């Protein structure tokens, strides 16, 4: 599942897309600037698509900056001209840029019109998206030959089945996000929580330094929990939920991911969403913390006593009683037989 970023195309860009679909342009280069899709370059056709391809595409690709390229073929389908969609994400580009472009790819395809896109090509080096690379891609689609590294990465993006292998003090990039290192004091606070020495730990992402840091460990009762949820920024919360259930006293650790809607920047929303799973993986595997429930909320007002109880102990659906097998019609069951015991039979004879 890819995350949506909220980035959209302006009306000017949509007009350019419309002209492009009608065949005016051979190529469009699209970038993300100020949280909007912008057309950085557009070129009319010069020759056949094969002769235009490398001279048009390759000079536009920067070594450290992702972008999208839409390249028009000469063939048409029922909707019009067919296009190649190129997602350029060089190895040396910034992690946040890679994440942003990966998460916005589906939006761009929708804005342009997915029915016009014949092929998708993903590349980290220019050889992947050159004309030769595109032809290799077509060959791989028509045969079971092994995929190139870039093709395998695109396949993994599409099926969203990337496994993570992360540690506490390293930053690890995955196709679904980034596992930022956890600061020492944050990790120690989580250790104390797992030993029941704390009952609340709040973590935040230091976006500038790309680190998960400690924000709050104030002793927190259930009634005070809503007050701990910021209204203007995202946070991770680990709460020791002390309660009774069916006569038993329980202490359950609950993870709460609070994200106050679109008051946060796109980058902040993406980072918190991407770092969540690797953080929980560290907590559960390395600290052996048993996180009973994982909850996502927009604001603290949702955290009532009833809400938290129902999340930790969801109500079971009542078991439906199966219908008894109906009896057959009385007239077709034959003569009713009366079976008597031996004593009854002798009494009747006398």
UniProtKB/Swiss-Prot annotation:
It holds the Pfam family Cofilin_ADF. SMART domains: ADF. This is Twinfilin-1. The modification Phosphotyrosine is found at residue 309. The modification Phosphothreonine is found at residue 349. The keyword Repeat applies. The modification Phosphoserine is found at residues 143, 277. The gene is Twf1. It comes from Rattus norvegicus. Residues 316-350 are annotated as: Disordered. SUPFAM superfamilies: Actin depolymerizing proteins (SSF55753). The modification N-acetylserine is found at residue 2. GO terms for biological process: actin filament depolymerization; barbed-end actin filament capping; conditioned place preference; negative regulation of actin filament polymerization; negative regulation of dendritic spine morphogenesis; positive regulation of cardiac muscle hypertrophy; positive regulation of neuron projection development; regulation of lamellipodium assembly. It comes from the Eukaryota. Keywords: Acetylation, Actin-binding, Cytoplasm, Cytoskeleton, Phosphoprotein, Repeat. GO terms for molecular function: actin binding; actin filament binding; actin monomer binding; ATP binding; phosphatidylinositol-4,5-bisphosphate binding; protein tyrosine kinase activity; protein-containing complex binding. Residues 2-139, 175-313 form the ADF-H domain. The keyword Phosphoprotein applies. It is found in: Cytoplasm; Cytoplasm, Cytoskeleton. Phosphorylated on serine and threonine residues. Belongs to the actin-binding proteins ADF family. Twinfilin subfamily. One of its GO terms (cellular component) is cell-cell junction. Interacts with G-actin; ADP-actin form and capping protein (CP). May also be able to interact with TWF2 and phosphoinositides, PI(4,5)P2. When bound to PI(4,5)P2, it is down-regulated. Interacts with ACTG1. Actin-binding protein involved in motile and morphological processes. Inhibits actin polymerization, likely by sequestering G-actin. By capping the barbed ends of filaments, it also regulates motility. Seems to play an important role in clathrin-mediated endocytosis and distribution of endocytic organelles. Gene3D superfamilies: Severin.
């Amino acid at each position: 599942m890819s995350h949506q970023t909220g980035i959209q195309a302006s009306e000017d860009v949509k007009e350019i897309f419309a002209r492009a679909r009608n065949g005016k342009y051979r190529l469009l280069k699209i970038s993300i600037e100020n949280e909007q899709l912008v057309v950085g370059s557009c070129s009319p056709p010069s020759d056949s698509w094969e002769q235009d391809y490398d001279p048009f595409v390759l000079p536009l690709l920067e070594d450290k900056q992702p972008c999208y390229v839409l390249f028009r073929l000469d063939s048409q389908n029922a909707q019009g001209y067919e296009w190649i969609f190129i997602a350029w994400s060089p190895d040396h580009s910034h992690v946040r840029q890679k994440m942003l472009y990966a998460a916005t790819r589906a939006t761009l395809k929708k804005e342009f019109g997915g029915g016009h896109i014949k092929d998708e090509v993903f590349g980290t080096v220019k050889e992947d998206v050159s004309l030769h690379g595109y032809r290799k891609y077509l060959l791989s689609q028509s045969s079971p030959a092994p995929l190139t590294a870039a093709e395998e990465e695109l396949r993994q993006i599409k099926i969203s089945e990337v496994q993570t292998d992360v540690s506490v003090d390293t930053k690890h990039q995955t196709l679904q996000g980034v596992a930022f290192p956890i600061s020492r004091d944050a990790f120690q606070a989580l250790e104390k929580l797992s030993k029941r020495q704390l009952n609340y730990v709040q973590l935040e992402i230091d976006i500038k330094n790309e680190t998960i840091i400690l924000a709050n460990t104030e002793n927190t009762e259930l009634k005070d929990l809503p007050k701990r949820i910021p209204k203007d920024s995202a946070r991770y919360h680990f709460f020791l939920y002390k309660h009774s259930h069916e006569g038993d006293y329980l202490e359950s650790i609950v993870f709460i991911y609070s994200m106050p809607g679109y008051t946060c920047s796109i980058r902040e929303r993406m980072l918190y969403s991407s770092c969540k799973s690797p953080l929980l993986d560290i907590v559960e595997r390395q600290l052996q913390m048993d996180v009973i429930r994982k909850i996502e909320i927009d604001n603290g007002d949702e955290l009532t006593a009833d809400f938290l109880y129902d999340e930790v102990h969801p109500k079971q659906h009542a078991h439906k009683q199966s219908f008894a097998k109906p009896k057959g019609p009385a007239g077709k069951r034959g003569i009713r037989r009366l079976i008597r015991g031996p004593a009854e039979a002798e009494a009747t004879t006398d």
